[in-house]
């Protein structure tokens, strides 16, 4: 089943109980290279880490968070915020490292909860209310997702009692839709605003970014 729907379809009854959030983070040195026109490499790493901190901080008020990453700096920051941390087992040169990391975290968490949420780690303008509303809407379906503000990417993927089947990467919204996930249509601008480009960051700042991101940007003006 695929398509684009607002909440309201009958639940299959598998969506009860707590959900767990997965955030997959690549090495900070390799992250957000499209921000290079506005930040030096060192500053870019600081901003990426700050966006992760703000994302974890917001998400953890809604559900427990596990970060899967090969990066020790990101892992330490996540631990300091009370998030679980899983070392990314993905081998170097893997053809699909992001989705492999997510599936490793899913396998790790499934013993504790059948309900999994995947969030991007670069949602500095996301409000806890937005994630809570999206999570409530997602419980209507076995699998669903929230597209990014451009309509091509995926900010969040939800699976209740079924495998995640992540399809993150280029044109992930289309791939998730074709895989049977339902696209949620709520107005959640912060949740939809993941950061890849300078324009994305400007949009997030207009919405209002979290304190860590605001401080990281202000320190390098």
Curated annotation (Swiss-Prot):
SUPFAM superfamilies: Nucleotide-diphospho-sugar transferases
Annotated knockout phenotype: Cells lacking this gene accumulate 7,8-didemethyl-8-hydroxy-5-deazariboflavin (Fo) to five times the wild-type levels but do not produce F420. They are also unable to decolorize triphenylmethane dye, and are sensitive to oxidative stress caused by the redox-cycling agents plumbagin and menadione.
Residue sites binding phosphoenolpyruvate per the record: 154, 169, 172
One Gene Ontology biological process: F420-0 metabolic process
Entry EC number(s): 2.7.7.105
Superkingdom to which the source organism belongs: Bacteria
UniProt xrefs under InterPro entries: CofC, Nucleotide-diphossugar_trans
Keyword terms, alphabetized: GTP-binding, Nucleotide-binding, Nucleotidyltransferase, Transferase
Pathway: Cofactor biosynthesis; coenzyme F420 biosynthesis
GO MF annotation list: GTP binding; phospholactate guanylyltransferase activity
Reactions listed under catalytic activity: phosphoenolpyruvate + GTP + H(+) = enolpyruvoyl-2-diphospho-5'-guanosine + diphosphate
Cited NCBIfam families: F420_cofC
Biological function: Guanylyltransferase that catalyzes the activation of phosphoenolpyruvate (PEP) as enolpyruvoyl-2-diphospho-5'-guanosine, via the condensation of PEP with GTP. It is involved in the biosynthesis of coenzyme F420, a hydride carrier cofactor.
Membership in a protein family: Belongs to the CofC family.
Official protein name in the record: Phosphoenolpyruvate guanylyltransferase
Gene: fbiD
């Amino acid at each position: 089943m695929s398509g684009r729907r607002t909440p309201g379809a009958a639940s299959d009854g598998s969506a009860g109980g707590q959900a767990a959030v997965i955030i997959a983070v690549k090495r900070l040195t390799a992250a957000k290279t499209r921000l290079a026109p506005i930040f030096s490499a060192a500053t870019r790493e600081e901003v990426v880490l700050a966006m992760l901190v703000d994302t974890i901080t917001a998400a953890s008020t809604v559900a427990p968070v596990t970060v899967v990453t090969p990066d020790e700096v990101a892992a330490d920051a996540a631990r300091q915020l009370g998030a679980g941390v899983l070392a990314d087992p993905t081998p170097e040169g893997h053809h699909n490292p992001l989705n492999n990391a997510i599936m490793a975290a899913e396998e790790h968490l499934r013993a504790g909860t059948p309900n999994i949420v995947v969030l991007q780690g670069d949602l500095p303008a996301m409000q806890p209310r937005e994630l809570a509303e999206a999570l409530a809407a997602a419980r209507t379906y076995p699998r669903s997702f929230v597209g990014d503000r451009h309509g091509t990417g995926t900010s969040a993927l939800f699976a209740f009692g079924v495998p995640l089947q992540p399809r993150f990467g280029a044109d992930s919204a289309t791939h998730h839709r074709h895989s049977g996930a339902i696209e949620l249509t709520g107005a959640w601008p912060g949740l939809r605003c993941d950061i890849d480009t300078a324009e994305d960051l400007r949009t997030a700042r207009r919405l209002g970014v979290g304190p860590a991101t605001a401080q990281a940007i202000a320190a390098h003006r």
